[in-house]
């Protein structure tokens, strides 16, 4: 009679085989020696257990090998994918690597072809940055022109105007503004002032002083040249300094040049010291040294004295002429002063021209 066995069951990866058990044999045959029966049953069960263990070991090995193979495959797949991604990115980088454009773009400012490619703005291929060597400017393709020059290269407008680029103004430039011929100093660079000759001869520099009578109305004289730092001339026309100044004339009498007398503005009494006599003597000597303008009146009648024309001419002073013709010193004198010169009264008369005119008329009538 063939024994029917159950199929093995897999549970959690383990295969469980059922144990073959015959109930009829156990119930029908009852042996007195229980020990012999138990030993025989144990011996019969051992080979089944060994078979089960071997089967489970084999299945576990197969499962582990399968898992290892799957992990290897997944790792290989991931490696392949990563390598593919890296190759793709490297290819993209190679393709998108910022290469210099082959075309030379002309400058949009000066239309010159002397340009060069510098870089891509923000690593963008659509914004290449170029530089023009002619106008020293940067610009981006598709963008606007930069006004301020940036970067390397020598700029033409770099720095201030050097000292050797001053304008030279001559008399020809000023003829349009003034009909009279004038001479204006021209400032040159400091390099032109340096010459090989260390000394100047006396015959090289000559200053011609023209007489005053030739230019009665036009004061075109210039001051002698002075040592001053080199600076550019004033861009506007300015009148030159006059060679002399007219002295004011009040009521037909000229006022002489200011002397070194006591020019204090306070009037009234002053303390009489010994120094006052010394100042009087010094002022007398100063008046004798200087040349004064004297008035020559052609008096036809005593009644037409105020309407006559006055002619002025310079006459050098001497001791005899001062006593005869110097009305300035006599204007301050009185009959009781015994020909004594008082500078205070002279200053007072000089400050008041009306009083001076009255004093002159009074002296002429005496």
From Swiss-Prot:
Pfam families: Zn_ribbon_Dof (PF02701). The keyword Lyase does not apply. Residues 70-83, 91-103 have a biased composition (Basic and acidic residues). A zinc finger (Dof-type) spans 105-159. Disulfide bonds: none annotated. GO terms for cellular component: nucleus. Keywords: DNA-binding, Metal-binding, Nucleus, Transcription, Transcription regulation, Zinc, Zinc-finger. Residues 22-103 are annotated as: Disordered. InterPro entries: Dof, Znf_Dof. It is found in: Nucleus. Residues 25-45, 56-69 have a biased composition (Low complexity). GO terms for molecular function: DNA binding; DNA-binding transcription factor activity; zinc ion binding. Zn(2+) binds at residues 107, 110, 132, 135. Transcription factor that binds specifically to a 5'-AA[AG]G-3' consensus core sequence. This is Dof zinc finger protein DOF1.3. It comes from Arabidopsis thaliana. The gene is DOF1.3.
């Amino acid at each position: 009679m063939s024994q029917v066995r159950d199929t093995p069951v897999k549970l959690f990866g383990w295969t469980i085989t059922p144990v073959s058990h015959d109930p009829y044999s156990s119930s029908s045959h009852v042996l007195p020696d229980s020990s012999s029966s138990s030993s025989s049953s144990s011996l019969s069960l051992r080979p089944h257990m060994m078979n089960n263990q071997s089967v489970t070991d084999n299945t576990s090995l197969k499962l582990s090998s399968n898992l290892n193979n799957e992990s290897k495959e997944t790792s290989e797949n991931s490696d392949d994918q990563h390598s593919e991604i890296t190759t793709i990115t490297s290819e993209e980088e190679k393709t998108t690597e910022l290469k210099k454009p082959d075309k030379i773009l002309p400058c949009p400012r000066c239309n010159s072809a002397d340009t060069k490619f510098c870089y891509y703005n923000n690593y963008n291929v659509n914004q290449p940055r170029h530089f023009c060597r002619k106008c020293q400017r940067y610009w981006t393709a598709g963008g606007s022109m930069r006004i301020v020059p940036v970067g390397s290269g020598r700029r033409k407008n770099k720095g201030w105007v050097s000292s050797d680029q001053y304008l030279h103004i001559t008399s020809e430039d000023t003829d349009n503004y003034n009909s009279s011929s004038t001479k204006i100093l021209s400032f040159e660079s400091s390099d032109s002032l340096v010459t090989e000759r260390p000394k100047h001869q006396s015959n090289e520099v000559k200053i011609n002083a023209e007489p005053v009578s030739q230019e009665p109305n036009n004061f075109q004289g210039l001051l002698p040249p002075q040592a001053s730092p080199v600076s550019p001339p004033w861009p506007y026309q300015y009148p030159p300094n006059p060679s002399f100044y007219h002295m004011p004339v009040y009521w037909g009498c000229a006022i002489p040049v200011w002397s070194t007398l006591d020019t204090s503005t306070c009037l009234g009494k002053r303390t009489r010291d010994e120094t006052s006599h010394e100042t009087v003597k010094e002022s007398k000597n100063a008046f004798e040294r200087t040349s004064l303008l004297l008035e020559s009146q052609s008096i036809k009648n005593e009644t037409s004295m105020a309407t006559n024309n006055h002619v002025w001419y310079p006459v050098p002073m001497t001791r005899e002429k001062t006593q005869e013709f110097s009305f300035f010193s006599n204007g301050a004198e009185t009959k009781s002063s015994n020909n004594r010169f008082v500078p205070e009264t002279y200053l007072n008369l000089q400050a008041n021209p009306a009083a001076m005119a009255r004093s002159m008329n009074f002296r002429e009538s005496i």
